[in-house]
UniProtKB/Swiss-Prot annotation:
One of its GO terms (biological process) is response to blue light. PROSITE patterns: BLUF (PS50925), EAL (PS50883). Keywords: Chromophore, FAD, Flavoprotein, Photoreceptor protein, Receptor, Sensory transduction. Residues 155-403 form the EAL domain. Binds to and releases the BluR repressor from its bound DNA target in a blue light-dependent (470 nm) fashion. A shift to low temperature also triggers a BluF-mediated relief of repression by BluR, suggesting BluF may serve as a thermometer. Blue light may act to increase the affinity of BluF for BluR, allowing it to be released from its operator. The protein has a reversible photocycle, and undergoes structural changes, probably in the EAL domain, in response to light. This is Blue light- and temperature-regulated antirepressor BluF. The keyword Hydrolase does not apply. The keyword Endoplasmic reticulum does not apply. GO terms for cellular component: plasma membrane. Residues 98-144 are annotated as: Joining helix. Residues 2-93 form the BLUF domain. InterPro entries: Acylphosphatase-like_dom_sf, BLUF_domain, Cyclic-di-GMP_PDE-like, EAL_dom, EAL_sf. Disruption phenotype: Reduces expression of ycgZ in the presence but not the absence of BluR. At 16 degrees Celsius, reduces expression of genes (including ycgZ) for several small proteins. While the BluR/F system is induced at low temperatures under blue light irradiation, it is not essential for growth under these conditions.
Length: 403
């Protein structure tokens, strides 16, 4: 199947520009052997390349390109399929934008085309060419430094509850996972994540439960989360708990129960965040919305967890605006390498900024992911790069320090 792949990257500062023609000559021979053709644009600092050919060969060559130390900030913009090649003259043809007038350069690029139809802007792949040549999207291109530009040093602040303080009859426990602002070295909140024992009643598969049992167990388990938060002496830190959306609907006294447990553990509603997962079906939305009103009227904040991973997404956001959203790890992973993920996350940030909704990123695992997200405007993060969730305690936090 004929595959089209487009990426952009940044040449290393210490890489001689004069060697680019030699590099292209080698790539041309290699690509032709794999039945891959394409064109490489260069503007003095950035590469923009289109590859066309059999899917496996294109992806094999792209993997090799990603390992090439002569460039960095490699971002895949497009991987699509087409009936015919657009640029089929050579395995790799270099087009130096610096040698052409700005007004003429696009037509000069199109003149390189080999399609039997004249290349036009209706072609999605060629719209990427226009954007690169005219530099109309520079504000969305973030040049992040190498991953080894930062050290992450644990602060030794971990704490664990004495096992004697935990009742042996308790079936569920909680792990606490911090949400942090790394550059200001500030803890935003601790998320209490339930850890279920295999023999726990609340660990029984949903299909094996009696009607309503899952929601009762979901609600009642939060009493332990508040008890542990109090025992860990989290002070005035925000505490985030997770609820199934339908728990608020099926448990009529859910809000009163939460408020009573918050008070019993010397906490205040204003430091509590209730998270709902976007992917859960909210079949009785009006009743859910009424329960949300009660939560917010009591001072409790509301967040959508795993935003972007479910099917409700923007429709849910149009009907219900939380105080916070947490962008799903599925969108965060390798965001520094993926043009589509970058565009989606930037759109989420812009939308939430317009609605004054705070945004955090979850599942951040690498320095590159964090640096790109910081550049995009996100300040709050959760993930193993900074700290892993700690069972019955709070973990040390690895704060970034510039080398």
């Amino acid at each position: 199947m004929l595959t089209t792949l487009i990426y952009r990257s940044h040449i290393r500062d210490d890489e001689p520009v004069k060697k680019i023609e030699e590099m292209v000559s080698i790539a041309n021979r290699r690509n032709m052997q794999s039945d891959v053709t394409g064109i490489l644009l260069f503007n003095g600092s950035h590469f923009f390349q289109l590859l066309e050919g059999p899917e496996e060969q294109v992806k094999m060559i792209y993997r090799a390109i990603c390992q090439d130390p002569r460039h960095y900030n490699i971002v895949e913009l497009l991987c699509d399929y087409a009936p015919a090649r657009r640029f089929g003259k050579a395995g790799m043809e270099l087009f130096d934008l610096r040698l052409h007038e700005r007004d003429d350069v696009l037509q000069a690029v199109f003149d390189k085309g080999t399609s039997k139809f004249q290349l036009t802007y209706d072609d999605r792949a060629l719209q990427f060419f226009r954007t690169f040549v005219l530099a109309t999207e520079q504000s969305t291109y973030f040049e992040i430094p190498a991953e080894d530009s930062w050290l992450f040093i644990a602060d030794g602040s971990d704490k664990e509850l004495d096992s004697c303080a935990l009742s042996p009859t308790i079936n569920d426990h909680f792990a606490f996972h911090p949400i942090v602002d790394p550059l200001s070295r500030r803890i935003i909140a601790f998320e209490a994540i339930v850890q279920k024992n295999e023999d726990s009643p609340s660990a029984i598969a949903v299909g094996q439960r009696k009607d309503g049992e899952i929601y009762t167990a979901d609600l009642k388990s939060k009493a332990l989360a508040f008890t542990m938060a109090h025992a860990l002496e989290l002070g005035d830190k925000m505490i985030s708990i997770n609820l199934l959306p339908m728990t608020l609907v099926n448990e009529p006294d859910a809000v009163s129960f939460l408020l009573n447990e918050i008070k019993a553990n010397a906490l205040v509603p204003e430091q509590i965040i209730v998270e709902f997962t976007e992917s859960e079906v909210i079949s009785r939305f009006d009743e859910f919305a009424e329960a949300i009103k009660s939560l917010k009227a009591a001072g409790i904040s509301v967040a959508i967890d795993h935003f972007g991973a479910g099917f409700a997404g923007l429709l849910l956001l149009s009907r219900f605006q939380p105080d916070r959203i947490k962008i799903s790890q599925e969108l965060i992973t390798n965001v520094h390498k993926s043009g589509p993920r970058q565009a989606i996350i930037q759109a989420i940030i812009k939308c939430c900024t317009s609605l004054e909704i705070q945004v955090s990123a979850m599942g951040v695992a690498t320095p590159e992911e964090w640096m790109w997200l910081e550049s995009a405007g996100i300040e709050m993060f959760q993930g193993d790069l900074f700290a892993k969730a700690k069972l019955n305690g709070i973990p040390s936090i690895a704060w970034p320090e510039k080398k």
